[in-house]
């Protein structure tokens, strides 16, 4: 009886060991599958983030360069006066050119962080840095675009209450150029909003993944 009891105990121990090993293997497989699926989802968001940053770079460079080159001289002039309009005649447009150029430079510098997010989709630090930085930069972009839009509106419509006459009837090409620059900057603002949403979604997914793991 003692031998039979010993034999039964060994059998139960072996069975429990096998079950435990199967459970550990299954848990590892589940963890690997979850990490692979989560990483693929976040890598897709990171790739979209990178492409969107490239588009924003093109948009901001276009906005800044178009505003910088906006200039028009009327074909008629007097002996002492020449009618000319340029971006440097308006402090707001100068602020626009400098600010949007800084935004374009930031976007170029942010590309390595976006690439790191593609290579390591489960890394939270690059995504957090991009989220904070994008939030700050979108404020600057919005301020520059809004200020320039106000001047463009006055250039097109004037202000009868202050006797400010519209100048776009005379400087049509100049107004068209600055209006295009403002539109491009506004598109860049939309890009930044999408980038911020992408970073927020990625961080939320990372928090849920690590908390559940």
Curated annotation (Swiss-Prot):
Protein topology in the membrane: Multi-pass membrane protein
Segments passing through the bilayer: 44-64, 95-115, 135-155, 181-201
Positions in the Cytoplasmic compartment: 2-43, 116-134, 202-213
Annotated signal peptide: none
GO CC list: plasma membrane
Domain of life (superkingdom): Eukaryota
Subcellular location: Cell membrane
Extracellular compartment residues: 65-94, 156-180
Modification N-acetylalanine occurs at: 2
Keyword Transcription regulation: no
Keyword field: Acetylation, Cell membrane, Cell wall biogenesis/degradation, Membrane, Transmembrane, Transmembrane helix
Entries under InterPro entries matching the protein: CASP/CASPL, CASP_dom, CASPL
GO process annotations (BP): cell wall organization
Family from the record: Belongs to the Casparian strip membrane proteins (CASP) family.
Assembly and interaction partners: Homodimer and heterodimers.
Purpose of the protein: Regulates membrane-cell wall junctions and localized cell wall deposition. Required for establishment of the Casparian strip membrane domain (CSD) and the subsequent formation of Casparian strips, a cell wall modification of the root endodermis that determines an apoplastic barrier between the intraorganismal apoplasm and the extraorganismal apoplasm and prevents lateral diffusion.
PANTHER family: CASP-LIKE PROTEIN, CASP-LIKE PROTEIN 1U1
NCBIfam families named among the record's database cross-references: A_tha_TIGR01569
Name the record gives this protein: Casparian strip membrane protein 1
Organism: Raphanus sativus
